[in-house]
């Protein structure tokens, strides 16, 4: 039985993984409450609201009941809570595929090496690009199979910045990188055309869950 302090949980739900190299898989999600970064195109602002205190054992009971092929810990910003590291390790002990989605502002060096980390890189339109944690790039270059980076693009200016940024940090062509359009702001066709024009070796994604369900729905 876990003796760690409870974590503050926004929601636990079962849905389709929508925005990573694991997109399309049924997935159990644990969304932790709290963030505070203020990204302009955040689509989970409700995760800033007070959550429910749950122990790791309680979380595990809920998650394992879904019998999902993968589990994702997300937020908010999950790494703001110190108990997240213990939760990730506990999930890895019981589940073969554990994902972490983080905003990319905090180092991931304390994350259990069995976890596959999906790390955001914030572009200029986010309003918070100065908080990107460059230390994560060094870690990913040493163990590229454990990490992928995701950049949400709102304009061609964002796209050109992102292309230069990932090349400048040495991760282009060496780490898995995903570009996606800001839902409702950038036409996906434009992003696809820019990538094809530039022969850019990155993956394009759409937020799959927003095309399946109401884009503003929670728990999907």
From Swiss-Prot:
Ligand binding ([4Fe-4S] cluster): 35, 39, 42
Enzyme class of the recorded protein, top EC level: lyase
Binding locations of substrate: 16-18, 31, 74
Coiled coil: none
Domain Radical SAM core per the UniProt entry, residue ranges: 22-215
Quaternary structure, from the entry: Homodimer.
The protein's name: 7-carboxy-7-deazaguanine synthase
Species assigned in the record: Chlorobaculum tepidum (strain ATCC 49652 / DSM 12025 / NBRC 103806 / TLS)
């Amino acid at each position: 039985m876990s003796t760690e302090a409870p974590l503050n949980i926004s929601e636990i739900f079962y849905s389709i993984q929508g925005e990573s190299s694991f997109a399309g898989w049924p997935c159990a999600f644990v969304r932790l409450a709290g963030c505070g970064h203020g990204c302009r195109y955040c689509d989970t602002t409700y995760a800033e609201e007070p959550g429910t205190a749950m122990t790791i054992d309680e979380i595990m009971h809920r998650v394992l009941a879904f019998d999902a092929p993968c589990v994702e810990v997300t937020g908010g910003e999950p790494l703001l809570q110190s108990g997240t590291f213990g939760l990730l390790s506990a999930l890895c002990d019981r589940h073969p595929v554990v994902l972490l989605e983080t905003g990319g502002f905090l180092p991931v060096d304390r994350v259990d090496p069995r976890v596959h980390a999906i790390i955001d890189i914030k572009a200029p339109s986010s309003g918070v690009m100065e908080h990107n944690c460059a230390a994560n790039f060094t870690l990913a270059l040493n163990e590229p199979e454990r990490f992928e980076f995701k950049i949400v693009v709102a304009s061609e200016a964002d796209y050109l910045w992102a292309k230069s940024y990932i090349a400048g940090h040495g991760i282009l062509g060496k780490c898995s990188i995903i570009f996606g359009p800001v839902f409702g702001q950038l036409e996906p066709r434009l992003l696809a055309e820019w990538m094809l024009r530039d022969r850019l070796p990155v993956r394009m994604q759409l937020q799959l869950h927003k095309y399946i369900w109401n884009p503003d729905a929670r728990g999907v």
